[in-house]
Amino acid sequence: MDSLINEIKSAQSSAELEELRIKALGKKGILTAQFALLKNLDEEEKKEKAKELNQLKGEFEREWTLKKEIIATEELHKKLLEEKVDMTLFAPSKGVGSAHPVMITMERIVDYFVSLNFAIKSGPLIEDDFHNFEALNLPKYHPARDMQDTFYFKDGMLLRTHTSPVQIRTMEKETPPIRMICPGAVFRRDYDLTHTPMFHQVEGLVVEEEGKVSFANLKYILEDFLRFMFGEVQVRFRTSFFPFTEPSAEVDISCIFCHGEGCRVCSHTGWLEVLGCGLVDENVFKAVGYKNVSGYAFGLGVERFAMLIHAVSDLRAFFESDLRVLEQFR
């Protein structure tokens, strides 16, 4: 037994200790074998021998437990030293995600109008003909429908070609005054340097009692908005046509690249077209059951703004998932 105790004291690892435990108390261990022999003794001898063996077993277990705690502490300390981290070392760089340039631009646009208490509204991407066309003064066979190549489903439903249906759905549910914007994805069958089948719009609508809203209000807010987005630019309004507004206008800003002098980007005109607007047509109000109201609406392409802000000539670069391109906009 003294030999086992000495071996415990000289053990250097948990593995050595475990071997000693098995040697003493395992199925074929020294003490286990001694306990098995007790059955061959008479009662008096068995009692004396059992007492002696229990004392030896207790001594072994105390020494073994004490040594186990010492070795466990030493092994933990050694492990911590081996696995310690030098906080002064440079960590390997990891790729960090960032917002997409189109989403950054959309958020900036939305932030401006939210600051003026415009509510943000949303609607379904799959629309019916009424909300996408008819309610917006575009009845069946109207020639203006040719302006938008539409994705149709077999049941007559379609992918919305603009976010204007959200305005119709909002007016169906709410009564004036209305002050809203509807940012979101839209879809048209077009794909070239300046068009993709899916892109994003932000449209706005203001409806008040008749006589409370004029083109002057629309002009003021859009001029302020465009200077918020592009800095101190000149803004001009050109008469145009949209089925859902009357009168209608296209809005241009002085070229932010040549400052109005004329360059390739602005086709040497000194102006960049950025959005469309107008006073809401009476037929649109009739479609939603509004009477004695007036209002204005406007709409812009988010990608168009992003292209101008970041000087990108090919719209498709935003959607081709080329990290070499997208990393430039962090």
From Swiss-Prot:
One of its GO terms (molecular function) is ATP binding. Its EC number is 6.1.1.20. Its cofactor is Mg(2+). It is an enzyme of class 6 (ligase). Gene3D superfamilies: Bira Bifunctional Protein, Domain 2 (3.30.930.10). One of its GO terms (biological process) is phenylalanyl-tRNA aminoacylation. Binds 2 magnesium ions per tetramer. Keywords: Aminoacyl-tRNA synthetase, ATP-binding, Cytoplasm, Ligase, Magnesium, Metal-binding, Nucleotide-binding, Protein biosynthesis. It catalyses: tRNA(Phe) + L-phenylalanine + ATP = L-phenylalanyl-tRNA(Phe) + AMP + diphosphate + H(+). Mg(2+) binds at residue 246. Its main location: cytoplasm. It is found in: Cytoplasm. GO terms for cellular component: cytoplasm. Belongs to the class-II aminoacyl-tRNA synthetase family. Phe-tRNA synthetase alpha subunit type 1 subfamily. Tetramer of two alpha and two beta subunits. This is Phenylalanine--tRNA ligase alpha subunit. It comes from Wolinella succinogenes (strain ATCC 29543 / DSM 1740 / CCUG 13145 / JCM 31913 / LMG 7466 / NCTC 11488 / FDC 602W). The lineage of its organism: Bacteria, Pseudomonadati, Campylobacterota, Epsilonproteobacteria, Campylobacterales. The gene is pheS.
